[in-house]
């Protein structure tokens, strides 16, 4: 099983497991993102499950193209919990991973942040690009940082299978008059607004 550059990991000793993510081949991300490298499979789409005591890879979970560049991974803080979340950077999707009744591990997509159609940017669509995820200490909220869209999101994950967006704060990003980017279609917004120049 070839490695595509491990990025982050989280472990749960109670379940004798460590799970890691894979960003991509270093020769690709060191030069900057090239969509041809994505199409060629040079960026990761798996999370990797290890036996914690034996320090051995036991399972690879394929997240598919919607899971390109899985970066940050977080178990719930409860040490007996056998589930958590992983954020896939490029297409801004979050997957819930969990231990199945058979004892192996699985994952499914629970959050999908759509790209925005834009003018005045390098591409006709701008993905959110997830750069970090964080669990609240009480395991109730999951926080996401959307680098290009410029927002920080709070999801209620009391039901981890069905996260619910409960807060959003815009802190920057590329969708501002200063950058000259105009949103022409946003699947999440009903009303369009723009921040005035100051």
Residue spans of the language-model regions?
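Surface-exposed loop and turn segments in beta-propeller and other repeat-based domains
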Residues: 1-4, 57-67, 106-125, 166-198
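Short loop/turn segments immediately following the C-termini of beta-strands
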Residues: 23, 78, 87-90, 99, ...
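Asp-box/WD-like beta-propeller blade repeats and closely related beta-sheet repeat scaffolds
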Residues: 1-13
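Residue-level recognition of a conserved intra-blade site in WD40 beta-propeller repeats
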Residues: 11, 75-77, 135
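Short loop/turn segments immediately following beta-strands, especially the blade-tip
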Residues: 49-55, 96-109, 154-166
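Short coil/turn segments that connect the beta-strands within blades of beta-propeller domains
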Residues: 14-16, 80-82, 138-140
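Short, conserved, GDST-rich strand-edge loop motifs in beta-rich repeat architectures
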Residues: 21-42, 94-97
């Amino acid at each position: 099983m070839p490695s595509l550059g491990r990025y982050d990991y989280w472990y749960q000793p109670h379940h004798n497991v460590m799970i890691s993510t894979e960003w991509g081949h270093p020769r690709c991300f060191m030069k900057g993102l090239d969509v041809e490298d994505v199409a060629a499979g040079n960026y990761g789409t798996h999370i990797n499950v290890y036996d914690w005591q034996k320090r051995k890879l036991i399972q690879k979970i394929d997240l598919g193209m919607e899971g390109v560049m899985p970066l940050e991974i977080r178990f719930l803080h409860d040490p007996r919990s056998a589930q958590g979340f992983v954020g896939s950077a490029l297409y801004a999707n979050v997957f819930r991973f969990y231990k199945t009744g058979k004892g192996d591990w699985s994952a499914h997509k629970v959050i999908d942040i759509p790209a925005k159609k834009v003018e005045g940017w390098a591409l006709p669509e701008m993905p959110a690009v997830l750069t970090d995820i964080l669990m609240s200490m009480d395991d109730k909220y999951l926080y996401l940082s959307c680098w290009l869209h410029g927002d920080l999101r709070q999801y209620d994950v009391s039901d981890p299978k069905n996260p619910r967006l409960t807060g959003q704060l815009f802190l920057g990003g590329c969708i501002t008059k200063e950058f000259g980017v105009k949103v022409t279609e946003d699947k999440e917004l009903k009303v369009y607004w723009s921040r005035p120049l100051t």
